[in-house]
From Swiss-Prot:
Miscellaneous remark of the record: Negative results: does not show antimicrobial activity against the Gram-negative bacteria E.coli (MIC>250 uM). Does not show effect on four different human cancer cell lines.
Function: Has antimicrobial activity against the Gram-positive bacteria S.aureus (MIC=8 uM) and the yeast C.albicans (MIC=16 uM). Causes hemolysis on horse erythrocytes (64 uM for 100% hemolysis). Minimum bactericidal concentrations have also been tested against S.aureus and is four-fold higher (MBC=32 uM).
Post-translational modification Lysine amide, affected residues: 40
Record keyword Hydrolase present: no
Subcellular location: Secreted; Target cell membrane
Annotated protein name in UniProt: Antimicrobial peptide AcrAP1
Length: 74
C-alpha cells in the first residue's frame, strides 16, 4: 500500500519538475528573444507577414467554398 503512494508522489514530482524545467528553459529564452526583436523592429515585419498569410488563407478558403458549392451533393 505504501509503495503505491510513494510511486504516486514520485510521478507527481517528476511531472512538476519537468514543467518547471520547460518553463525555465523555454519561456525565458523566448521572452528575451521577443524583447530583442521588439527593440530591433522585427516584430512589425513579422506581423505584416502574418496578416498577408491570413489574407491568403481567407482567399483560399473562399475559393474552396465556391468549389464545394459547385460540386453535386450525393
Amino acid at each position: 500500500m505504501e509503495i503505491k503512494y510513494l510511486l504516486t508522489v514520485f510521478l507527481v514530482l517528476l511531472i512538476v519538475s519537468d514543467h518547471c524545467q520547460a518553463f525555465l528553459f523555454s519561456l525565458i529564452p523566448h521572452a528575451i528573444s521577443g524583447l530583442i526583436s521588439a527593440f530591433k523592429g522585427r516584430r512589425k515585419r513579422d506581423l505584416d507577414g502574418q496578416i498577408d498569410r491570413f489574407r491568403n488563407f481567407r482567399k483560399r478558403d473562399a475559393e474552396l467554398e465556391e468549389l464545394l458549392s459547385k460540386l453535386p451533393i450525393y
